[in-house]
């Protein structure tokens, strides 16, 4: 059976940041909440199976919460930045936790759906200079990050025959 990789680089880190900065005490939902995120993956798994393919999920890459915070607050006033930090509970680490929550949901979904998942997160975290794997926005893979992921995927594909020829 042919296998197909299901890769979605986004996590739940897409919010209306300007709206949050203007009203940090309000209720704010991500552009794609966790339920919709899992449903999107579940649909993609079902589509692959409907086409006679075996789906294989790929975990999310790492992110750098401090760089991402700087990126999403560029152009904001100091007060807006403080408001956003307030909404995050006073720590940019909350951004990493949200990202990790979405990534962990992929591993749970893989187990529930009985599909393989390729862990690209761990080799990135194991890198001595993981910050070099990301662009300045803290979430986009740099050329070095893309190379690490490509190497990891190639190794696993070769070793375990994850893609049929």
Annotate each predicted stretch with a short phrase.
Residues 1-143, 147, 151-165:
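Alpha-helical cap/lid subdomain in secreted, periplasmic
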